[in-house]
């Protein structure tokens, strides 16, 4: 009976000492995980910000392309069809209805003044 008590006491002491080591190890492991979790949270917070910045950069790039393409249209040369309501004939030209050879056409053309 004495050996049973000694064996039980020995097993109990080993369990407690190993349990403490596991507890310390678990605590350190939890600290590492929380530190990593914080870095993941920072990364997760920055990720949408990065996506928004990329989207903003794309939109600004499109705006700059639009501003490049929004320049005034080129003028229309002599003998080219034009719109009577919105003539874009070059300087020195006027948008007129064709005479003689172009009567059958239903559009206006740029002619010299």
UniProtKB/Swiss-Prot annotation:
GO MF terms held by the record: sodium channel inhibitor activity; toxin activity
InterPro entries the UniProt entry points to: Toxin_22
Keyword line: Disulfide bond, Ion channel impairing toxin, Knottin, Secreted, Signal, Toxin
Pfam families assigned to the protein according to its UniProt record, in alphabetical order: Toxin_22 (PF08092)
Region (Disordered): 60-83
Localization per Swiss-Prot or TrEMBL: Secreted
Record propeptide residues: 22-74
Function: Probable ion channel inhibitor.
Name this polypeptide is given: U11-theraphotoxin-Hhn1a
Species assigned in the record: Cyriopagopus hainanus
């Amino acid at each position: 009976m004495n050996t049973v008590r000694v064996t039980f006491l020995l097993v109990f002491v080993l369990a407690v000492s190993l349990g403490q080591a596991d507890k310390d190890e678990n605590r350190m492991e939890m600290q590492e995980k929380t530190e990593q979790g914080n870095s993941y949270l920072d990364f997760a917070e920055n990720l949408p910000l990065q996506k928004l910045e990329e989207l903003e950069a794309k939109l600004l790039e499109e705006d700059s392309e639009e501003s490049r393409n929004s320049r005034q249209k080129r003028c229309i040369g002599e003998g080219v069809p034009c719109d009577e309501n919105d003539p874009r004939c070059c300087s020195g030209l006027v948008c007129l209805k064709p005479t003689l050879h172009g009567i059958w056409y239903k559009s206006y053309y740029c002619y010299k003044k």
